[in-house]
Amino acid sequence: MPTVGVFNKEGNKVADMELNENVFAAEINEYALHQVVVALLANKRQGTQSTKTRSEVRGGGIKPWRQKGTGRARQGSIRSPQWIKGGIVFAPKPRDYRVSVPKSMRKVAMKSALTSKVQDNQMIVLDSLNFEAPKTKSMIEMLKALEANKALIITAESNEVVYKSARNIQGISVIPANNINVYDLLKYEKLIITKDAVSKIEEVYA
């Protein structure tokens, strides 16, 4: 079983913790990671883009000049794509970009992402994470002690105090354990996670 150190908010190591090898020491599947990240980004798209084709642009119903005898190139409508204010060729229309990924692949990708953080020594386990009140200064001091500039903080439950303490810090994001996703795990350089959150993740993915 992989073992990691457990730290307090001051950055001091207080204990060691064994991790579930089925979750944090799994085989890294790059194909699954790619498929899930592509799907997550595609599913974020609104798909509301819309421009007009030549049949939808107002005007242009009359031929601008006769077919022959003017010396100019033949034209059928002033709303053809080559004209200023003409329609758009293959105009983008509203569409659904949603991509479905099998649940088993999502699970493999999640284990791969968590394993990569452990292997790269980028996962920091905290014994607890609580502040008396929302204070950005307290969060900055903790991040400095843990040497984390760009980090994803995972808590066991939604914690408004922790969230408010971190929301004004660039490169830091806070999410509860039940909302983690592969994209966020890979996007941030370091993963800061509480012991309770580790247990929750192991319950779901082990």
From Swiss-Prot:
Subunit (UniProt): Part of the 50S ribosomal subunit.
Job of this protein: One of the primary rRNA binding proteins, this protein initially binds near the 5'-end of the 23S rRNA. It is important during the early stages of 50S assembly. It makes multiple contacts with different domains of the 23S rRNA in the assembled 50S subunit and ribosome.
A family per Pfam: Ribosomal_L4
Keyword vocabulary terms for this entry: Ribonucleoprotein, Ribosomal protein, RNA-binding, rRNA-binding
InterPro entries: Ribosomal_uL4, Ribosomal_uL4-like, Ribosomal_uL4_dom_sf
Encoding gene (name): rplD
GO terms, biological process: translation
GO terms, molecular function: rRNA binding; structural constituent of ribosome
Organism field: Clostridium beijerinckii (strain ATCC 51743 / NCIMB 8052)
HAMAP family in alphabetical order: Ribosomal_uL4_B
GO cellular component, one term: ribosome
Residue stretches spanning the membrane: none
Family from the record: Belongs to the universal ribosomal protein uL4 family.
SUPFAM superfamilies xref list: Ribosomal protein L4
Chain spans, region Disordered: 47-77
Coiled-coil ranges (or none): none
Domain of life: Bacteria
Name used for this protein in its record: Large ribosomal subunit protein uL4
Gene3D superfamilies: 3.40.1370.10
